[in-house]
């Protein structure tokens, strides 16, 4: 009898603890115009648990231990906001200006398997750039594409899933664990990041996502899920996640679209050593066809990491947040096309690891580029084919549809934009997939020259993981 009473008391105590949890709802908006901040994280201060993520309307719900708790809202480019909880909370983030990040970053340690996945994604970056090269300035985020494919591959099976696994270099379970670890690091759940990544699933209310696919997207990719599948909602989400750099992703949505899956990435950071705007002047730039044109080239002499590979030189210009722009400049007797035809990520990584600090005389163009890149022919060229074929695509784990009704990827594209100036860089990309789915003696530094006065390849790279966030070419046109 005593044991039964003790057990009953324990059950009542546990029930009381569970009941003590309070679910708080609220919205996160920007201070300037009260627009919803989509994809902001809201976490309970002092509690180790995954944060809530705001939806398309900036709304969130989160369990707190009691009404004395505090929550903290964060979104890239905004100062964090901490508030005591209350029902129907309104959290206003100050969007007056992008804060200069601290030099402190979250720590991350990748396992051997995770390093292998990252290597595959970085190698994919170069294969992708080769596939789209048309001797035109371009900008891409291969990481955005890889993350989106990793998320939606949880809804695939058979050959459709296998082809994506081959491209990404891992099985779905490994991809899920990798991005669950990488996204919080890159998007700055701590101080010091000016990079954000967000995922969204806009679902046609006529169909219902399968629970396993839905939960994998939310838990591993922090996906925002909405049944409001329309042009305005999709474009509003894209504009919000890219701070207006990609304001319009879709023009129309087919009524038979089951799902539009999106990944958005945004980067904004200052150079560690800014260029003097007064030093920017028109200088001859040699186009791919040999023609010379006057372009605004920025100039500075400073200490940078510099290396030389087979037929090219490499320069790494650091940002304040732990990332760098890495530029590969073909030798004068070579060309960017020749470099692209043979170079691999392993080649670049070897030169990167052997690079030394030099005093470099830099000439580099101030430029902007905006590209819309259709991805279906590119993916097919890279071996991913069945997802685009209604007769062969297998998305049986994606949603509940009538037996025999095909679900396939009817559209896949990426829009990307980059702005490079004397003070720093802004870059954004949205990928869409629609389913119809060192104090010793002062060191002596070598003097080097890096005059980017001809076409070159560039990357924005995280210095800790080596992850390529953006990659592109500049031809000067």
Specify the residue positions occupied by each region the protein language model found.
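Beta-strand-rich domain onsets/edges
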Residues: 14-23
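Short, ordered, surface-exposed loop/turn motifs in non-cytosolic proteins
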Residues: 22-24, 31-45, 66-68
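A short, solvent-exposed loop/turn motif at the edges and junctions
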Residues: 44-47, 72-84
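Short, acidic Ser/Thr/Gly-rich low-complexity loop/linker segments typical of extracellular
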Residues: 48-59
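Short strand-edge motifs at loop-to-beta-strand transitions and within beta-strands
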Residues: 60-62, 89
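Extracellular beta-sheet/turn segments enriched in Thr/Pro/Gly and aliphatic residues
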Residues: 85-104
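Detector for small/aliphatic-rich hydrophobic stretches
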Residues: 98-228
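Non-catalytic, conformational "gating/processing" segments within enzyme and secreted inhibitor domains
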Residues: 135-136, 145, 178-333, 353-442
């Amino acid at each position: 009898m005593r044991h039964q009473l003790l057990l009953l008391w324990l059950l009542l105590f546990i029930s009381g603890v569970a009941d003590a949890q309070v679910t708080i709802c609220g919205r996160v908006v920007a201070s300037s115009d009260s627009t919803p901040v989509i994809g902001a994280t809201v976490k309970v201060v002092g509690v180790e648990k995954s944060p809530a993520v705001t939806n398309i309307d900036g709304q969130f719900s989160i369990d707190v231990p009691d009404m004395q708790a505090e929550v903290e809202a964060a979104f890239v480019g905004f100062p964090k906001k901490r508030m005591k909880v209350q029902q129907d909370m309104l959290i206003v983030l100050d969007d007056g200006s992008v804060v200069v990040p601290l030099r402190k970053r979250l720590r991350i340690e990748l396992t051997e398997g995770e390093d292998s996945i990252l290597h595959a994604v970085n190698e994919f970056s170069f294969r992708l750039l080769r596939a789209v090269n048309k001797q035109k300035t371009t900008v891409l985020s291969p990481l955005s594409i890889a993350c989106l494919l990793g998320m939606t591959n949880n809804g695939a099976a058979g050959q459709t899933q296998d082809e994506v696994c081959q491209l990404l270099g891992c099985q779905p379970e490994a991809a899920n664990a990798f991005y669950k670890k990488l996204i919080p690091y890159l998007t700055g759940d701590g101080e010091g990041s000016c990079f954000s990544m967000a995922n969204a699933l806009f679902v046609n209310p006529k169909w219902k996502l399968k629970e396993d696919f839905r939960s994998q997207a939310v838990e591993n990719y922090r996906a925002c899920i909405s049944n409001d599948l329309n042009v305005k909602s999709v474009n509003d989400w894209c504009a919000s996640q890219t701070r207006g750099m990609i304001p319009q992703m879709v023009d129309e949505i087919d009524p038979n679209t089951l799902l539009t899956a999106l990944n958005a990435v945004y980067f904004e950071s200052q150079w560690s050593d800014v260029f003097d705007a007064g030093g920017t002047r028109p200088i001859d730039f040699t186009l791919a066809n040999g023609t010379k044109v006057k372009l605004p080239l920025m100039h500075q002499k400073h200490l940078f990491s510099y290396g030389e590979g087979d037929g090219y030189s490499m320069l790494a210009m650091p940002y304040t947040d732990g990332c760098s722009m890495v530029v590969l400049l073909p030798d004068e007797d070579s060309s960017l096309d020749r470099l692209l035809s043979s170079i691999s990520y392993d080649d670049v990584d070897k030169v990167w690891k052997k690079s030394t600090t030099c005093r470099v005389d830099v000439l580099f163009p101030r430029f902007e580029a905006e590209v819309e890149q259709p991805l279906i022919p590119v993916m097919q060229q890279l071996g991913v084919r069945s997802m685009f074929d209604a007769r062969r695509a297998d998305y049986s784990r994606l949603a509940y549809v009538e037996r025999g009704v095909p679900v396939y990827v009817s559209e896949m594209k990426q829009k990307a934009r980059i702005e490079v100036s004397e003070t720093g860089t802004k870059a954004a990309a949205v990928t869409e997939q629609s389913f119809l789915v060192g104090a010793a003696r002062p060191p002596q530094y070598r003097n080097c020259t890096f005059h980017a006065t001809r076409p070159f390849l560039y990357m924005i790279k995280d210095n800790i993981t080596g992850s390529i966030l953006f990659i592109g070419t500049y031809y000067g046109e």
